[in-house]
Amino acid sequence: VTIGERLSTTAPAVNKAFTERDPEPIIKRAKQQLDAGATYLDVNIGPAENDGEDLMKWAVQLLQSEFDNVPLALDTTNQKAIEAGISVYNRSKGKPIVNSADAGDRISNIDLAAANDAICIALCSSGMVASDNDERMMHCQNMLERGMSLGMEAEDLWFDPLFLVVKGMQDKQMEVLEAIKMFSDMGLNSTGGLSNNSNGMPKHIRPIMDS
């Protein structure tokens, strides 16, 4: 599964399009990602504290109507907005993804995913990046137990060891790769933001690293 991440309010053009409910820039970026091989699209509307529910519904309906019910990851800290997006989501091509939970203040997003038969990206942290793989696995186990106690299948929890910036944290990269192997050995799914690796690198280098 490849999740396209370029529909994010961190990009000024996308933020403007979401704010103005302008479909064209959203559709254009979505098509570019799907043409490049994305199988899911991440819809990051930011905190969206004022109009998040309406905005997420609008974005979900726009993208799924334009691209044959493309599966989506709903990405916001606003839980009500995620629930609103799920309420209009068509599952024919795949379950919605809740992006994301962690083992700290955001662990309730696992509850949200369980209640809505959704996949949940589970960040192996508790607000801060884990210091080592022992800590990552502790967080992983806590979230796995939480999800399964609520009736989730283990396959619907996608564990993210948190990819780190190569430019300043090269010594930590092997730990992240080892964590992915540990997840696999446990029969668990993993995911990660590959573009985090290239953050801060020269623009001509980033596409090579991200690929």
Residue ranges and their predicted role:
Residues 1-157, 164-211:
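Domain-level signal for soluble alpha/beta catalytic cores
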